[in-house]
């Protein structure tokens, strides 16, 4: 039986089983390939027993995640949504999921990767005998890939699918990136562009003398720190995620912290979005709750911007951005997260922002001086160990 299902899945993807045999698969590729094949085996087994083939997709929602107080990150619960072949409302999404599995297997077999956009076109075709296409647009295939991730317990990048690079790093670390040696202290004004796939088989850490990591929210703030050579003066790595950090950035932060024992400090906007970004870096995200152990950094610290900084730093009135009703609602939702609830410093922080009635961006510190954030604010927070946990 396994041989039969394996052939079917491979044929659908357009590759041959010998393709994988011609190259040496890493342990993770072997596991992912095995999980994809097992998915196909289950379909064939159900069909041979004359049962309705189905897939049980773990539910990706807040209601299906739990906070592990011991590990200090969120984990996925046991709730699933069943996707059945012989259910008219589910048949197409069932087909799309197996089609995505087939495409991923083909990529692994051939030792190639593709973008989310590339995968969409790779899987796009007319369904024989109908006027239907396999996918209406890329948003459908993106969602299916996320479903496939949680079903086979593998990151998208382990399915050989990547997103566009977003995020950067500079500092005293030398990497081996796909065989090329990269000195991140010699990357000019733009820094090293953090790729989507940063697993050990792609990115190796050759040498690092940094003492910690400062992660800032936006490229604009990162550029100020880089131009002022903050990373040279304080012997650290400086990273950014272009707003909400993408998977590659979060996975890299996790690896740098776990493997090199580097503390992670976050400098984010004083608004609900900044709080949420910190939550995702520290505890993990709902969509990737099944992989929090490889994505989250439970020891990450929140340096700022803080709700008390308007008065503490004597900022100008012009930096205030009025909190909207949506902002206030979101802040209360975040305060109610199990990993924030009960933490007095965080309750005080969020309450203060709500009382203030305004939010602030890190760039607001420029109203003091263009280099105030790099020369005074962050050095003082680090020296005084003044952060939220």
Region spans (language model):
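Nucleic-acid enzyme cleavage-core boundary/entry regions
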Residues: 1-265, 272-389
């Amino acid at each position: 039986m396994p041989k039969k299902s394996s052939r079917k899945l491979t044929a659908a993807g357009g590759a041959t089983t010998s393709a994988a045999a011609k190259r040496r698969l890493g342990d993770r590729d072997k596991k992912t390939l095995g999980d994809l094949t097992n998915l196909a085996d289950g379909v064939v087994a159900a069909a041979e027993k004359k049962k309705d083939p189905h897939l049980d997709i773990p539910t990706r929602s807040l209601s299906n995640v739990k906070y592990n107080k011991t590990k200090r990150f969120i984990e996925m619960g046991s709730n699933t949504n069943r996707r059945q072949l012989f259910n008219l409302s589910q048949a197409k999404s069932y087909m799309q999921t197996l089609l995505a599995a087939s495409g991923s297997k083909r990529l692994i077999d051939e030792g190639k990767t593709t973008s989310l956009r590339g995968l969409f076109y790779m899987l796009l075709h007319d369904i024989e005998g109908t006027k239907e296409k396999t996918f209406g647009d890329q948003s459908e295939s993106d969602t299916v890939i996320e479903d496939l991730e949680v079903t086979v317990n593998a990151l998208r990048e382990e399915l050989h699918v990547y997103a566009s690079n977003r995020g950067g790093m500079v500092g005293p670390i030398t990497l081996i990136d796909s065989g090329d040696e990269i000195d991140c202290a010699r990357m000019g004004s733009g820094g090293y562009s953090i790729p989507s796939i940063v697993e050990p088989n792609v990115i190796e850490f050759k040498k690092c003398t940094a003492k910690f990591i400062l992660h800032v929210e936006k490229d604009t703030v990162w550029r100020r720190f880089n131009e002022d050579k903050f990373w040279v003066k304080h012997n650290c790595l400086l990273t950014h995620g272009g707003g909400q950090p993408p998977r590659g950035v979060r996975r890299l932060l996790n690896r740098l912290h776990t493997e090199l024992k580097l503390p992670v400090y976050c400098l984010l906007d004083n608004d609900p979005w900044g709080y949420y970004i910190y939550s995702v870096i520290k505890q993990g995200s709902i969509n990737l709750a099944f992989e929090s152990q490889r994505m989250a950094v439970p020891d990450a610290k929140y340096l700022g911007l803080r709700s008390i900084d308007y008065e503490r730093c004597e900022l100008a009135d012009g930096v205030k951005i009025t909190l909207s009703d949506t902002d206030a609602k979101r802040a209360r939702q975040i305060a109610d997260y199990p990993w924030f609830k009960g933490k007095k410093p965080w309750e005080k922080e969020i309450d203060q922002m709500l009382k203030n009635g305004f939010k602030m961006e890190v760039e607001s510190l420029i109203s003091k001086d263009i280099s105030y954030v790099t020369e005074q604010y962050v050095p003082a927070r680090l020296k005084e160990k003044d952060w939220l946990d």
